[in-house]
Amino acid sequence: MRVIFAGTPEFARVALAQLHGAGFEIPLVLTQPDRPAGRGMKLQASAVKQWAESHAIAVAQPRSLRLDGKYPEDAAAARAAIEAAQADVMVVAAYGLILPQWVLDMPRLGCLNIHASLLPRWRGAAPIHRAIQAGDPQTGVTIMQMDAGLDTGDMLLVEKLAIQATDTTATLHDKLAALGGQMIVQALELAAAGQLEPVRQPAEGVTYAHKIEKSEAAVDWTQPVASIDRHIRAMTPFPGASAQIGSDTVKLWSSEIDSCSCPPDMRKGLILSANSDGVRVACGDGVLKVTELQRAGGKRLPAADFLRGFDLQAGQLFDLPNP
């Protein structure tokens, strides 16, 4: 089976490697154009491009696939490359470009998407972050037959995965990437045998995982302690939960719900203690112990190391975000 692969970040690279390892012929990879990244803002190729080129797979990087859009020459060149590839199917994973109908219609078996949620819950751009943030007990991967809607196509395979109390977006991402890679291999093997059975998504339970914005990073200490703990885990590694204390912004990377109680009249954001064990902060209904922190321009550090270079003390107050 000939497979065109469309994807950009590490989540997609894992699936591409799984398909290649399973012996599928991959004549073409589509990925986003190189972007400036890092402190030097040098152009950097996507994880998918780097892997594809290291395995001598042809790569196309159109800025758009819309023939009537802003970059019609890119779309036309991509169309020619897709036609020349004569693929049976296109696999899409976190690609980042909208696929017009002509793309969906071109492969014999259409386009299959690897989506990191249990559809129809968390359609959209940030399903892993939002599942943790919402306190979902489980998530998973859906292999979907793509249509013109936003993650609305028929479901082909679904696998569930429990969200652990310590999972961050980073750890859950890696688990779901591995699961998605295994599932897309299984889906294509079933497709080759004519054994895939599409199931329509239910109309009930639809939610949207809107893109994570940097403006969401700030911790609201008036919220319940469990909600703040989930927020920190959901914002790790991007954009990183943040707290303001005076003129300093501190990133919060790891936390635990403390067993200490918090009187209802205690000021929210008040530092109750700061020692090698962690920084305990009063929250809406309890106490959060922050165990890994980072100052602006510094490194992520365990609380003990962080406090050697940043003077946090009991009685200080983290700012509350503007309403």
Swiss-Prot record:
Q: A Gene Ontology CC term for this entry?
A: cytosol
Task: Tell me the superkingdom of the source.
Answer: Bacteria
InterPro entries referenced in this protein's UniProt entry, alphabetically: Fmt (IPR005794), Formyl_trans_C (IPR005793), Formyl_transf_N (IPR002376), Formyl_transf_N_sf (IPR036477), Formyl_transferase-like_C_sf (IPR011034), GART_AS (IPR001555), Met-tRNA-FMT_C (IPR044135), Met-tRNA-FMT_N (IPR041711)
Name the coiled-coil region(s): none
Q: What is its EC number?
A: 2.1.2.9
Q: Any idea which positions bind (6S)-5,6,7,8-tetrahydrofolate?
A: S117, L118, L119, P120
* Sorted UniProt keywords: Protein biosynthesis, Transferase
Q: Which reaction does it catalyse?
A: L-methionyl-tRNA(fMet) + (6R)-10-formyltetrahydrofolate = N-formyl-L-methionyl-tRNA(fMet) + (6S)-5,6,7,8-tetrahydrofolate + H(+)
The entry lists its GO molecular-function terms as: methionyl-tRNA formyltransferase activity
Q: Which family does it belong to?
A: Belongs to the Fmt family.
| Functional summary from the UniProt entry | Attaches a formyl group to the free amino group of methionyl-tRNA(fMet). The formyl group appears to play a dual role in the initiator identity of N-formylmethionyl-tRNA by promoting its recognition by IF2 and preventing the misappropriation of this tRNA by the elongation apparatus.
- Give the protein's recorded name: Methionyl-tRNA formyltransferase
Per the UniProt entry, what species is this protein from, by scientific name? Polaromonas naphthalenivorans (strain CJ2)
Gene name, Swiss-Prot/TrEMBL: fmt
